[in-house]
Amino acid sequence: MDKENLYQEFVALMGEEHVFLEEPMKKHTSFKIGGPADLLVMPRTVEEIRQSVEICKKSKTPYFVMGNGSNLLVRDKGMRCVVIKIAENFNEVRFEGNHVIVQTGILLSTLSNQIARACLKGFEFANGIPGTVGGAITMNAGAYGGEMKDVVKSCKVLNHQGEIIDLSLEELELDYRTSIIQEKGYIALEVVLALQEGKYEEIRSIIDDLTVKRTTKQPLHLPCAGSVFKRPPGYFAGKLIQDCNLKGFKIGGAQVSELHSGFIVNIDNASAADVLNLIAHIQKQVKEKFDVGLHNEVRVVGEV
């Protein structure tokens, strides 16, 4: 990779304040872990996203698309690619009756509050999920009985041919923590949500109740990446881990949360290796004790 030439190309496209060389990924993940990315860019428009991908393809440079890094563990050696971060630079919202049209870089909590103020209900579940709309639609994020497929009408994506296509709810194939976007490697650009009219006080009350539940049961005050494991059929990952007496168990700076065993927290400048070793230890213990396989919900990326 000719980093310097690529850097200049991206600066010409979006300005140097949105392009970063040798950028520490710990600054861009909720785990606060990760070595440097060769190049990280933060596009502001659909066209900048499309051209960013085009620059990478023309130069045969690998690229990786991320949101705000709330479900990401970047390995300690970092990422040998261009990281395209679709986050706070790409966050416009439009209201059209009961429909909300949103760019995918907006945070779920920010959007949830805007939707509440517009007196629309159905999106309360998303308020405390620490991610962007793009990440949420890509993995069909959900919590407390709600998930994205309950509220999504359609989604504009960038496909591998550089075309922007509209996918209906059916075409999105949203399932437990997966979608056609994830399977095909598309880039989510704009989501249309279909909601219902509601009363502000009732919507706010639901959001406040869920906030209390989250803050008392989840270690949101510490660097983490949410639930580390997908829910195994018929079980709860956190309960299995707790029943292996692993609550509070540490490897290096990484610890099984003392508040919720389904979370791993960075308590003392943990490395990615610490977290990966802890994940492997948890999986081994749960498999040996219960004969249940735990599979990662957190996405692990970067140079091995």
UniProtKB/Swiss-Prot annotation:
Domain FAD-binding PCMH-type, chain residue ranges per copy: 33-198
Listed InterPro entries: FAD-bd_PCMH, FAD-bd_PCMH-like_sf, FAD-bd_PCMH_sub1, FAD-bd_PCMH_sub2, MurB, MurB_C, MurB_C_sf, Oxid_FAD_bind_N
Catalytic-site annotation from UniProt: 177, 227, 297
Predominant localisation class: cytoplasm
Pathway: Cell wall biogenesis; peptidoglycan biosynthesis
Membrane-traversing stretches: none
Family the entry assigns: Belongs to the MurB family.
PANTHER family, per database record: UDP-N-ACETYLENOLPYRUVOYLGLUCOSAMINE REDUCTASE (PTHR21071:SF4)
Protein name per the record: UDP-N-acetylenolpyruvoylglucosamine reductase
Species per Swiss-Prot/TrEMBL record: Alkaliphilus metalliredigens (strain QYMF)
